[in-house]
Design a protein with these regions (language model features):
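Conserved SAM-binding loop of SAM-dependent methyltransferases across substrates and taxa
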Residues: 19-32
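Conserved alpha-helix/loop element of class I SAM-dependent methyltransferases that forms part
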Residues: 1-9
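S-adenosylmethionine
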Residues: 10, 32-156
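Conserved class I S-adenosyl-L-methionine
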Residues: 9-18
Length: 156
């Protein structure tokens, strides 16, 4: 789904990439998209570097650091989309994501069942970070897998 939401030749920053979701699958599915994976843990960045190298993903870059760190923000710069999967509560994520946003940047946060609750609870914090028009898309995981909720918002 993320591949379908992202425009042609877009730049995507994936905050707290962990094992590479959703950034690595996006890089595979969409070679036209530049993907920057931000991950603070050394062992995970080593793993991500290996995956990127083995799969020859020239459109994917791994950056070790925390999204809220100024030197990481300067190194990475702004993006058309900022994404994450189960990294932090929406309010905190909105603040971190704003560091990589320009006017029109789209936040795409993959969340669990708490997505709507987080939007209601963190609405002011999300707004202070410059995000508007929050919406939720529910994706069915089938019988064996929990549903995923995609929270979208636009930076103004």
């Amino acid at each position: 789904l993320l591949g379908e939401l992202v425009s042609v030749n877009a730049r995507v920053v994936d905050i707290g990439s962990g094992a590479g979701l959703p950034g690595i699958p996006l890089g595979i599915a969409r070679p036209d998209v530049e993907v920057v994976l931000i991950e603070p843990l050394l062992r995970r960045t080593k793993f991500l570097d290996e995956v990127v190298e083995k799969l020859e993903l020239s459109n994917v870059t791994v950056v070790r650091g925390r999204a809220e760190e100024g030197h990481i923000q300067r190194q990475v710069g702004s993006a058309d989309y900022v994404t994450s999967r189960a990294v932090a509560p929406l309010g905190k994520l909105a603040k971190w994501s704003a560091f990589y946003a320009a006017k029109g940047t789209i936040l795409v946060a993959l969340k669990g069942e708490s997505a709507i609750e987080e939007i209601l609870r963190d609405k002011q914090e999300v707004g202070r970070a410059g995000w508007r028009n929050e919406s939720v898309i529910q994706l069915s995981g089938g019988e064996e897998v929990d549903d995923t909720f995609v929270v979208k918002a636009v930076h103004i």
